[in-house]
Amino acid sequence: MKSFTDNLGRAWTLVVNVATIKRVRALCNVDLNSIIEVEEDGKPSARLLERLSSDPVLLVDVLYAVCKPECDQRNVSDEDFGAAMAGDAVEQATDALLDEVIDFFPAAKRAAFQRILSASRRFGEAARKRMEAMLADGDFEARLVSELERLTGLSRSAQGSAE
């Protein structure tokens, strides 16, 4: 079982089993069983993973559905649950959910999915490091302003006189 902590400091435990997958299907119309699929040509497909990563509202709805028995025990509504989910809490919950979903699968499938997820995480970490390096570059803001000026046709002096 994996866990995460929301922005109110509440710890939540994720348990993915057949009942959980059924509950998420019913409440969110999302099939966690297809988080990663292998296409006919043998290539991995992560359409659901992409959908969840691009829609934080759906992601938190899925997390709530997974945590629903615990939420019911604590009298936490989906609105209250969602209000405590932002930033690092969402990232931590996403990692825990993905690990727990992958642990649900039988050994052979689990091993393949763990490799796919590991590669995805390495790619994400490399992208994060590139972004940090770009932001640390002293010329970044000047290049950004220059590009915005080019795109809008406005210059800094024109912006100052318009204010």
Functional labels for PLM-detected ranges:
Residues 1-10, 32-57, 61, 68-163:
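Charged interaction scaffolds used for protein-protein
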Residues 12-14:
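Short, isolated positions in well-ordered beta-strands
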Residues 19-37:
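Short, surface-exposed, low-complexity cationic segments
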